[in-house]
């Protein structure tokens, strides 16, 4: 009997040591399975550390993209102050992973991203400085239920504006062949928050100048269009449109973030958009809501006068 238990104990010890040698933290998996796939001229970071069992942190990242048509046939450099990955679907991102399988989840943050590529300077002609960009992403696909939950997609231009988007969609597969998602996907809920702290006051005049118009004229055109849509709408729809109109009218200095929401009575797809012009369908069919701290009652029907 003693020999039997000794054999079992030995086997368990062997398995335990083997499991310990196989176990890898998030940083080790990234450096072994993901990093070698990067087609970059250079990829470095000043320091790195694991984060829990499946995450990692990289500090002062430098990535040099080789010259190619997308970069104007010249090298481009991207720098990121801090990369934080809380979790990532490593199994779907390995080199030998199936091409038709999309990563099922990711939760990460990129803080202080800058670059010398044209993309990072795209807004400079409009008077917007080339400021660091912060990005946060948190999503998960449930393969069995075919549900995509985008908890957060946040893009922030430091000192200029922040946009936060979230949604839940039915009918989304974890297969890469998602071309039919626009037909199969049905929206359950969605939210968009625009927190402007100076971006609109630079973009609107610059865009108006491009069109040979004054900023006020361009804003009034948008408000008149909203006023036209507001005709014949019910109280709940008008309340939401008042928030949107007030935010647009305050483009020089918004009084807080504008938050838009959708929660259809039944899951909605692109084929349902033809209903949007029906009276009150925006609220009754699509569950549209809008909130803005500076909302002025009657702003939607006020049209161009809301900007004065």
PLM feature segments, named:
Residues 1-8:
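Bacterial N-terminal signal peptides that target proteins for export
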Residues 9-16:
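Bacterial N-terminal signal peptides
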Residues 17, 21-308:
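Glycine-rich, small/hydroxylated-residue low-complexity segments
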